[in-house]
Structures are given as structure tokens and as C-alpha cells.
Amino acid sequence: CIRDRSNVLSAEGREMLAKDFPEIRTIASNYFTGEFAYVQEFEVAKDGIVEQPRIISGAIIDDYMKMAALSELNMHFVNSHFIHPDDLLDEDRGAALGWEKMKSNLAEYMDWLVDSAPSLRQLTGSELSGAIQRYGAVTFTKTVTEQSIELKLKNFYDEAYFMVRINEGTPGEVSGGKLTHLTGNLYLLQAKEPTVTIEKLED
């Protein structure tokens, strides 16, 4: 994985990385637009490099960072955070607060994250890269009847995750996967097999 400290990467530089450094499989930069920043989506690029943006960074957890984190939990159910090693030395990025306060900010944020989204998987950068590859490759067809919801997956490797909203009925037994309730009628589905069937119970 490569991450440029300034998040600046030109189109020419991006092309060179893929061509001259085939051992680089992942680039981590910005999810939100910034001046001169290399902006990414969670995806696999045409050249095969995994685009792995970070959502927030640092130890100054301000309102913008909270909004960004919450928005991405709602969008992809993902949180990615990066802290610069030299944040401890840069007053604009938290050094003026002191290490104890910076550490406390991060601890409070992680406590909030675990309490708010306990179903999030805790992955390393390399593991997240693999998850993005699976997410980008898998497709599905859905069949809904009065008795069940069936998903048939293509390009399935070993597991896949979906956000599932069940508007009618209550989910019962699940074959080929695991269903975790998130909120209201929204569920997190872990597909463990290429075919997943969710039984529908009457309300």
C-alpha cells in the first residue's frame, strides 16, 4: 500500500505507479475533495490497483470529521482513519493539544464508533484492500416471494457483505449467510455462499 503524505498525485504519477511499480497493489488517499488532493472512491481501478480512501485523519475530532464519519457509515458502513506520525510535532494538526489530549480524543472517537456500529469489522489496510476487491467484483440477482428473499451472487470469492432493507415481513432463518440487525428494517448481510436465502416471517 502506498500513501503520499500530501495526498497529491497527478495523473502522470498515477500512471507511472501502475506501470513501473507493479508490486504496489493499493493506493490510499482522500475520499473528500481537497486542494490538489488525489480523490478516490472505494473501488478497483482499471489497472488493477485498489483505491482505498481514508475518510478522516488526525486527532482533532471536529464537527466536520464527525459528519464525514457518520456519512460514510450510512453510505458504505465503512470507517477508515489515518493519523500522521508527525501530528505530534505539528501544532496545526494537534501538537498544541499535547499527546494526552490527542490520545483522549482518539479513544473517545473509537468508543463512539464501537458503540454506534458494533458490527464493523476491524481490518488492517491490507485486509480492507481485499474487502474492496470483493466488493467491487461481486454482483447479484434478487428473487423475492411471499416466503423468502433469495440472492444469487456472481464473482463470489469467499464472502461478501450487503446492506439489506427488508420492508415486508420479518427475517427468519438464513441459509448461506448471516444477517445482523442494524436499525429499523436495515440489516447487514454476510454472504458465505454464492446463494443466500432469507426466510420471511409474517409480522
Model-derived features with residue positions:
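Catalytic domains of cell-wall/extracellular-matrix polysaccharide-remodeling enzymes
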Residues: 2-46
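Extracellular glycoside hydrolase catalytic/binding regions
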Residues: 27-31, 48-61
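Solvent-exposed beta-hairpin/edge-strand motifs
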Residues: 163-178
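C-terminal beta-strand-rich structural cap/linker in extracellular carbohydrate-active enzymes
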Residues: 182-203
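Short, surface-exposed amphipathic charged segments that create phosphate/polyanion-binding patches used
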Residues: 40-46, 68, 137-143
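Catalytic grooves of carbohydrate-active enzymes
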Residues: 3, 7-14, 20, 54-131
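A generic structural motif
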Residues: 25-39, 121-127, 181-185
